[in-house]
């Protein structure tokens, strides 16, 4: 008989004595000209869980320029679960540039030593997190979909995609140094704001001169995203998979989405076939979504797709295979050909919504 494989043991790493009593969790509040990215509030929900496990305090860190609602923004992390908020405000911090933002954040970390520092896995967050981790000489787990604290070791464990999204790995931070850092994908559960909560706002002085910075801001051009997919924050998504067979049939997804006022999503094979752009891909190597309604047409429900959408409030699956994995976690299932079911749904919704419009 072959021997049973031994269970992996937890790797114990002796903490640097400087960090033994460190317990606080920080969330970097991402904002642009006074507008906060929603991922910041989602991270505060994750941060609150970590703090409750560690027994420390949760801080929001706001970095911005003068006149960008700095103090007002600092009140919002408290309403979303933070105990306190740091405010770093300076003219040089008005528009994001890596050098001043890295200096602002690393100087603050060095002075106060948090246990964990979280940033959104956004364009800004990914750029800033790497340079901060390198400057501090600490570890960084990027593009996480889930975070968990090991209360025994105080290590931060995470779930993230690997091998181009075909597998999930669960790296754990076993290091002597702090903070433990992670960038987290948007569209995790967002805590409900509580206007009755209050907390301290700590203004932190920051000093840097323009000549110290290599990059220069020449002009600010707002990003017009009206015609771009915004899957992570859509309330309704209609997504199609290879069960639709060809690009012409994928148009049926667009037809239903138009009637419902929904965003269009796609599985990875659809994007690879060129039927939909990459920004519409849902799943481990695409977008993580949490809509109120997710309609999956011709999608089998493989793990790579599931991890990107199983947080939806309601999932309706359409598939010809009654044993398709998607039926294991869908709230409602239609065993049938999506090519015939989608037009029927489109007409039914169109008629019902028309009736409601006339009545109301």
Swiss-Prot record:
GO terms for biological process: fatty acid beta-oxidation using acyl-CoA dehydrogenase; nitrogen fixation. Pfam families: ETF, ETF_alpha. The keyword Flavoprotein applies. It comes from the Bacteria. FAD binds at residues 293-321. SMART domains: ETF. Coiled coil: none annotated. InterPro entries: DHS-like_NAD/FAD-binding_dom (IPR029035), ETF_a/b_N (IPR014730), ETF_a/FixB (IPR001308), ETF_alpha_N (IPR033947), ETF_asu_C (IPR014731), ETF_asu_C_CS (IPR018206), Rossmann-like_a/b/a_fold (IPR014729). GO terms for molecular function: electron transfer activity; flavin adenine dinucleotide binding. Keywords: Electron transport, FAD, Flavoprotein, Nitrogen fixation, Transport. May play a role in a redox process involved in nitrogen fixation. FixA and FixB form a heterodimer. Belongs to the ETF alpha-subunit/FixB family. This is Protein FixB. It comes from Azotobacter vinelandii. The gene is fixB.
């Amino acid at each position: 008989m072959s021997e049973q494989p031994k269970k992996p043991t937890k790797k114990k790493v002796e903490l640097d004595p400087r960090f033994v009593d460190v317990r606080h969790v920080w969330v970097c509040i991402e904002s642009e000209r006074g507008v906060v990215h929603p991922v910041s509030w989602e991270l505060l929900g994750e941060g609150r869980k970590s703090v409750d496990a560690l027994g420390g305090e949760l801080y929001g860190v706001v970095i911005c320029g003068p006149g960008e609602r700095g103090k007002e923004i600092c009140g919002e992390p408290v309403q979303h679960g933070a105990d306190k908020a740091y405010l770093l405000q300076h003219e040089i911090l008005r528009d994001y540039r890596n050098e001043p933002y890295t200096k602002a954040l690393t100087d603050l970390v060095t002075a106060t030593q948090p246990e964990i520092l979280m940033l959104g896995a956004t364009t800004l967050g990914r750029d800033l997190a790497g340079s901060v981790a390198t400057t501090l000489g600490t570890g960084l787990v990027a593009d996480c979909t889930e975070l968990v604290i090991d209360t025994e070791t105080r290590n931060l464990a995470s779930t993230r995609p690997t091998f181009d999204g075909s597998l999930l790995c669960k790296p754990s931070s076993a290091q002597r140094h702090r903070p433990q850092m992670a960038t987290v994908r948007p569209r995790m559960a967002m805590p409900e704001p509580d206007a009755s909560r209050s907390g301290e706002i700590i203004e932190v002085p920051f000093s840097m001169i323009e000549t110290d910075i290599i990059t220069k801001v020449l002009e600010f051009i707002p990003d017009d995203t009206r015609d771009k997919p915004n899957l992570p924050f859509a309330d309704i998504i209609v997504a199609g998979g290879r069960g639709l067979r060809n690009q012409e049939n994928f148009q049926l997804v667009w037809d239903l989405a138009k009637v419902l006022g929904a965003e269009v999503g796609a599985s990875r094979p659809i994007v690879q076939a060129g039927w939909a752009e990459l920004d519409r891909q849902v799943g481990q190597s695409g977008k993580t979504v949490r809509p109120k309604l997710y309609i999956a047409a011709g999608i089998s429900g493989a793990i790579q797709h599931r991890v990107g959408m199983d947080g939806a409030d309601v999932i309706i699956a359409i598939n010809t295979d009654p044993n398709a994995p998607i039926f294991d976690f869908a709230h409602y299932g239609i065993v049938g050909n999506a090519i015939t079911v989608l037009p029927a749904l489109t007409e039914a919704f169109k008629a019902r919504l028309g009736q409601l419009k006339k009545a109301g």
